[in-house]
Amino acid sequence: MYYGISQFSEAYNKILRNSSSHSSCQLVIFVSCLNIDALCATKMLSLLFKKQLVQSQIVPIFGYSELRRHYSQLDDNINSLLLVGFGGVIDLEAFLEIDPQEYVIDTDEKSGEQSFRRDIYVLDAHRPWNLDNIFGSQIIQCFDDGTVDDTLGEQKEAYYKLLELDEESGDDELSGDENDNNGGDDEATDADEVTDEDEEDEDETISNKRGNSSIGPNDLSKRKQRKKQIHEYEGVLEEYYSQGTTVVNSISAQIYSLLSAIGETNLSNLWLNILGTTSLDIAYAQVYNRLYPLLQDEVKRLTPSSRNSVKTPDTLTLNIQPDYYLFLLRHSSLYDSFYYSNYVNAKLSLWNENGKKRLHKMFARMGIPLSTAQETWLYMDHSIKRELGIIFDKNLDRYGLQDIIRDGFVRTLGYRGSISASEFVEALTALLEVGNSTDKDSVKINNDNNDDTDGEEEEDNSAQKLTNLRKRWVSNFWLSWDALDDRKVELLNRGIQLAQDLQRAIFNTGVAILEKKLIKHLRIYRLCVLQDGPDLDLYRNPLTLLRLGNWLIECCAESEDKQLLPMVLASIDENTDTYLVAGLTPRYPRGLDTIHTKKPILNNFSMAFQQITAETDAKVRIDNFESSIIEIRREDLSPFLEKLTLSGLL
């Protein structure tokens, strides 16, 4: 079943009712540990439940195998389970092997609705919805953003019609079995041997062989009509599931809608909402662009007039200020913020010498000496900083950078400084990716004596390495969680530093890829395979691989051919002898995003990867909540990609 936006408070009150009457913890939240939007949404929920004196347990989870393991370990007394950031695209009842009848405690005689001793709530913005969760289950309860009521009318009708037709077919089969038994063994055997290709002939043959003709012409006609309807409705559902995946909303925005409904909005929750939504800006710009005006209105509503406010060392404010498509401008130099910006790099091709010359000429045209541009922003000439917006407006059009200025959200932390939402998201993402130390210095793996181990031992060793790596990601989740606290400024600064280091590594890897021409054009998609490099270990983390992929995709969007081709990006992990593979959708050049906001480009890699895995003997692990990210054995990559190229699925 599902809750529309106006019904979120009903679900919340139900959770509260079931969880607040016990002295022990009855509420568990499973959260995707590599998802900033899910992190911020869970933080809001945690603060809300804490205010209501409801005990809850938060469990960061990496992928589906961990989901199954953690679910199997839940205590029987857990009556509410929230899945945040995942769960919407799979049949949860089947995957978790849930028998709803085991949990039934009451049934309403009039409506037929059942009450369960455990309810599973799904907060997930990935689409398409799995329709079994939405229409076929009462124990699975999904928070919907309007997708179901607005766009799934045809699919809803097809789903319920198929259920009715299945029941009718079951009744007919029971009736047919009884008649077959009355007709004798010989007749049944003869009927089984009929293999006519034409369905009509088959039905008539079966009817004739049953002697006294228990199936009349009307029954045959009904059967044919039923088969036609089943085929038609199955086609509707197949088309729905094969359309491709995307993210249609911010989970943080959905939780904030709940808070608005129950009167619990404040600046802290709004800031978390802004961070969660901003985290989608790079990969799902249409979602951010749609939600931005709503966030802007909410900031104006909750923020007191600056004329009446007095700044103190502990004042926490949230304002709308000019922001830029530049990398960590307030925490680096103007030059570096241009140089390491994905947007500027793609527009000016900074990865080659001509691009660097254009950048230097641009600063000269703006009247900003390179020596001044390379000063840390904090110490840069204040007159230039004050006039920066005007300088940009006058000079950046000729370089295609006219969209570099936009309004953004800035959080002021008293006398400790200020940070924009986009910069905060960069810091959080870096903490999720790297944590307390650089990836290369952590999780040291001993590769000694690998030649002396047999295949089974190597597999066990690889599994253990993967487990250790995922434990680190869970640890990084809690580091990012703590960084959301306004008092943990040192963690935030650590994240800023890590983000700068990561972006340099991404830039260096991206430049090497473009200079060596490692991106291959394979008719229907672009392919890039990383097999060496000083920063190769960084790309064991899906977030870092996607960071590199977004850098490359943006460069491709601004390239001369400007073909809207998706990309497959693969990186070798020598420790496990596998490739981490990500399928990325193409991207419109910046400036064209607003034209296409109503029709986002869907990711077809999820279905393609699953289908090709089913058709081949390749050892593939599809475990990530981002289903377009897979792990594949080294020797299986080439045949897998060959099959993908010829499949016609993209």
Curated annotation (Swiss-Prot):
Residues 168-227, 442-462 are annotated as: Disordered. Its main location: nucleus. InterPro entries: CDC45. One of its GO terms (molecular function) is DNA replication origin binding. Present with 1730 molecules/cell in log phase SD medium. One of its GO terms (biological process) is DNA replication initiation. It comes from Saccharomyces cerevisiae (strain ATCC 204508 / S288c) (Baker's yeast). Belongs to the CDC45 family. This is Cell division control protein 45. GO terms for cellular component: CMG complex; DNA replication preinitiation complex; nuclear replication fork; nucleus. Keywords: Cell cycle, DNA replication, Nucleus, Phosphoprotein. It holds the Pfam family CDC45. Assembles into a complex with MCM5/CDC46. Interacts with MCM10. The modification Phosphothreonine is found at residue 453. Residues 168-205, 449-461 have a biased composition (Acidic residues). Required for initiation of chromosomal DNA replication. Acts at the origin of replication. Also has a role in minichromosome maintenance. It is found in: Nucleus.
